[in-house]
């Protein structure tokens, strides 16, 4: 009986740990895409700064 209790607790802890890891991975993906879009817009501004179209 004691073995079954330990096994159940171990399985519950394992499932909780995998649930906690999912939001972290999603947040990292959102952060990476935000950094990527910022890099693209900053690169655009750097290349087009001072051009006649940017002065308007």
Curated annotation (Swiss-Prot):
Propeptide: 22-30
Keywords, comma-separated and alphabetical: Disulfide bond, Neurotoxin, Secreted, Signal, Toxin
N-terminal signal peptide: 1-21
GO MF entry, a single one: toxin activity
GO cellular component terms attached to this protein's record: extracellular region
Tissue: Expressed by the venom duct.
Subcellular location: Secreted
Post-translational modification: Contains 2 disulfide bonds.
Comment on protein domains: The cysteine framework is XIV (C-C-C-C).
The name this protein goes by in its record: Turripeptide XIV-01
Species annotation: Gemmula speciosa
